[in-house]
């Protein structure tokens, strides 16, 4: 009797398992095409920017050679700051404002306490419009266009030992040539959001200056300025930003 009961129990168990497997085989799962969308770009922040710009200094170096100074060499390092925000009305679009500048000086001492030198300073202030493409999470590529105004200041000085009373004399010379420009700047930046609040940037740009106007000592206009003296040149930039970065 016990054997018969165990046999029936085993038979029922095997039948139940087999029936369950048949039911599972008869179940058909419908395939659904799930479209995975890339997240839109959103960034709001500000921070430090640095740029190595390769500008033409050939005509400036001719002047350096004529007065006994060493040549200037590119690149020039510029530093400053930028702030930007995404525009919600147009997805992935961003506007920004930045300002940065830098300078180099070539100086040499001569006999009789005479010091000659040239200081070359360049700066940019302007706006930028960028469009963000999110490649993968936290990584975006942003091509864009910058525009604004730029300046080049060239200070040429020749001084000897100087004291306060020498202001009344002509024992020194110092002239400042100041050039002002408009510029446009195509650029491409690669930006990585380390966290939702910290972002790193690496990019390239090429400012193009036009509409130049030159003055000496902010008084007299200067003519026959070499065309190479412009804020034009390929540049590599980097940045460190804090804010809100959601992409």
Task: Locate predicted features.
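Extracellular loop and loop/strand-boundary signature of outer-membrane beta-barrel proteins
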Residues: 65-70, 107-118, 169-176, 221-229
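Gram-negative (and chloroplast) outer-membrane scaffold detector with strong preference
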Residues: 90-167, 181-182, 192-194, 233, ...
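Predominantly the C-terminal beta-signal and adjacent terminal strand-loop region
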Residues: 189-247
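Solvent-exposed loop segments that connect transmembrane elements
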Residues: 159-171, 216-222
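Membrane-embedded beta-strand positions of outer-membrane beta-barrel proteins
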Residues: 44-50, 83, 95-97, 129, ...
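Short glycine/proline- and aromatic-enriched beta-strand/turn motifs that initiate or cap beta-hairpins
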Residues: 21-88, 241-247
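Bacterial Sec-dependent N-terminal signal peptides
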Residues: 1-29, 244
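Outer-membrane beta-barrel transmembrane strands
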Residues: 72-77, 81-85, 178-190, 194, ...
């Amino acid at each position: 009797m016990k054997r018969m009961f165990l046999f029936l129990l085993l038979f029922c168990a095997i039948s139940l398992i087999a029936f369950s497997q048949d039911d599972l085989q008869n179940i058909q799962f419908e395939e659904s095409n799930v479209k995975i969308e890339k997240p839109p770009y959103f960034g709001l922040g500000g921070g430090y920017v640095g740029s190595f710009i390769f500008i033409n200094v050939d005509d400036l170096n001719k002047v350096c050679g004529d007065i006994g100074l060493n040549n200037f060499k590119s690149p020039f390092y510029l530093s400053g700051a930028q702030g930007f925000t995404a525009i919600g009305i147009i997805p992935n679009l961003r506007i920004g404002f930045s300002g940065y500048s830098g300078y180099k000086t070539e100086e040499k001492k001569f006999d009789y306490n005479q010091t000659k030198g040239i200081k070359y300073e360049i700066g940019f202030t302007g706006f930028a419009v960028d469009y963000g493409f999110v490649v993968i999470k936290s990584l975006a590529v942003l091509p864009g266009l910058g525009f604004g105004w730029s300046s080049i200041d060239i200070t040429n000085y020749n001084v000897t030992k100087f004291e306060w009373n020498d202001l009344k004399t002509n024992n020194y010379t110092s002239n400042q040539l100041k050039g002002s420009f408009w510029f446009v700047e195509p650029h491409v930046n690669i930006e990585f959001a380390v966290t939702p609040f910290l972002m790193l940037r690496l990019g390239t740009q090429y400012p193009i200056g036009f509409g130049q106007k030159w003055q000496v000592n902010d008084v007299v206009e200067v003519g026959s300025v070499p065309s190479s003296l412009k804020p034009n040149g390929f540049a590599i930039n980097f940045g460190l930003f804090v804010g809100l970065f959601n992409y």
